[in-house]
């Protein structure tokens, strides 16, 4: 009887550890995709911040106008 209880306890502990590992992996993967989206936004801004001339500034302003998230053009003038 005692062996059965020990076996059941060990089984429950293993199940709990595996369940938490799967949950932690899902959380890491969700954080990773959010981080990737932020990185893409930063890369887009770097393209706009580094204009080589008026043509690129105009393209930057045009891209900014077409984006619903863009509220001002101050990063285009740098």
UniProtKB/Swiss-Prot annotation:
Where found?
Answer: Secreted
Q: In which tissues is it expressed?
A: Expressed by the venom gland.
Q: Which UniProt keywords apply?
A: Disulfide bond, Secreted, Signal, Toxin
Give the Gene Ontology MF terms in alphabetical order.
toxin activity
Q: Does the keyword Disulfide bond apply?
A: yes
Q: Which GO terms describe its cellular component?
A: extracellular region
Q: How is it modified after translation?
A: Contains 2 disulfide bonds.
Q: Which residues form the signal peptide?
A: 1-24
Residues making up the propeptide: 25-28
Q: Which family does it belong to?
A: Belongs to the scoloptoxin-04 family.
Its name, as the record gives it, is: U-scoloptoxin(04)-Er1b
């Amino acid at each position: 009887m005692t062996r059965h209880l020990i076996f059941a306890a060990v089984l429950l502990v293993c199940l709990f550890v595996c369940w938490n590992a799967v949950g932690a992996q899902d959380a890491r993967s969700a954080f990773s995709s959010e981080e990737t989206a932020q990185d893409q936004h930063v890369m887009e801004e770097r393209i706009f911040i580094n204009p080589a001339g008026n043509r690129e500034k105009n393209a930057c302003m045009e891209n900014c106008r077409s984006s619903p998230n863009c509220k001002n053009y101050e990063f285009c003038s740098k």
